[in-house]
């Protein structure tokens, strides 16, 4: 399980601004930027107790246009840390932003 500090250390390596869950109103930087959150867990149990804690970690990359180089930079950081992830992408019309979502367990 990665600690909060370890996760933020990884995100710092991208050189992009980031925040947990969301940026405060009026504080959102210009894209590209990252948002991360831990929306739940998939803990492993033994004898009716949590034997091994496994948190979900979502990292969202927001850009105003498709930016494969930013995706590659984030993926290199995740790969170097040995994290397995799944990736999806969508365009958020109301925000005029692309979101690339990286989902993993830590």
Which residues does each PLM region occupy?
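Long, contiguous binding/interaction regions
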Residues: 1-56, 62-106
């Amino acid at each position: 399980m990665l600690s909060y500090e370890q996760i933020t250390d990884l995100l710092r390596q991208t050189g992009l601004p980031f925040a947990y869950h969301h940026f405060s109103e009026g504080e959102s930087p210009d894209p590209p930027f990252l948002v991360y959150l831990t929306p739940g867990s998939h803990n492993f149990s033994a004898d009716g107790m949590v034997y091994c804690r496994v948190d979900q970690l979502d990292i969202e990359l927001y850009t105003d246009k498709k930016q494969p180089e930013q995706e590659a930079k984030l993926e290199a950081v995740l790969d170097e840390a040995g994290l397995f992830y799944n990736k999806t992408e969508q365009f958020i019309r109301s925000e005029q932003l692309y979101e690339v979502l990286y989902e993993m367990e830590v």
